[in-house]
């Protein structure tokens, strides 16, 4: 929750971090489903993506991406950034644990 407080200090920074997280988990999903690097946002991190993707199933990755996207939308709609991030991080704590 300290991370939520620090990140919430700048709304724009929070949105940037959330977009980065969406891209990361999207890359994990793309790799998991296709094994291809051509569609990755971060092809230079393909080895790390390959290793990390093995810890998730597709359904969990979609849920994570949707949760982050929903939080991003709330912040863009002027919801309290800190509260949105705290709720997101608590939700993600149960989702990003290894399968």
Language-model segment annotations:
Residues 1-59, 66-99:
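AAA+ P-loop NTPase domains with strong preference for DNA replication initiators
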